[in-house]
Design a protein with these regions (language model features):
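Histidine-anchored, small-residue-rich loop motif
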Residues: 1-161
Length: 161
């Protein structure tokens, strides 16, 4: 009874059954994940399946080992979205450098970057996604050990003036 009254009152005042709230707590996928889901460990290959190309799968991005569900913004992270290049991979390096033109930047490999600056940037992005009202943490990506040379330094200015 009280829930029905609350929904009707909300609709009367805000034209929304949730008092205008549109975050993850009214997303059926998030509720299902909270009730029945569990954090998953992904390989890089498994994570690549969640790039938005299959509309039946969620869209995941990785940031230095942490994986987030960003399906709520399919128009941003989906195949035709402006940030589609982040989907289905751990692109920690691109989050740090801001260099989106070089495909080698879309990796978790932070070698060659200033470690203090890189960790601060990574923490900032992880905090953003952890605290988001529409995205949520779903697991971790377990990477193979890094081999070979690190990516070439990007000549892109991180924050142009």
């Amino acid at each position: 009874g009280i829930l029905l009254f609350n929904a009707v009152a909300s609709w009367w005042f805000t034209s929304s059954a949730t008092w205008g709230y549109t975050g993850k707590w009214v997303d059926g996928r998030f509720i299902k994940y909270q009730l029945f889901g569990q954090h998953t460990n992904f390989t890089s290959q498994e994570l690549s399946l969640y790039n938005g190309s299959d509309p039946n799968l969620p869209i995941y991005i990785g940031i230095y080992g942490r994986v987030y569900d960003v399906t709520a913004s399919r128009h941003i992270y989906g195949p035709k979205g402006p940030y589609a290049f982040f989907s289905g991979k751990d692109a920690a390096r691109a989050f740090v450098t801001g260099c989106f033109q070089n495909q080698e930047e879309f990796t978790h490999d932070l070698r060659g970057l200033n470690p203090v600056e890189a960790q601060a940037d990574i923490k900032g992005w992880q905090d953003y996604y952890d605290g988001s009202h529409k995205y949520w943490f779903v697991g971790n990506v377990i990477h193979e050990p890094l081999t070979g040379e690190p990516p070439e330094p990007c000549e892109h200015r991180k924050f142009p003036h």
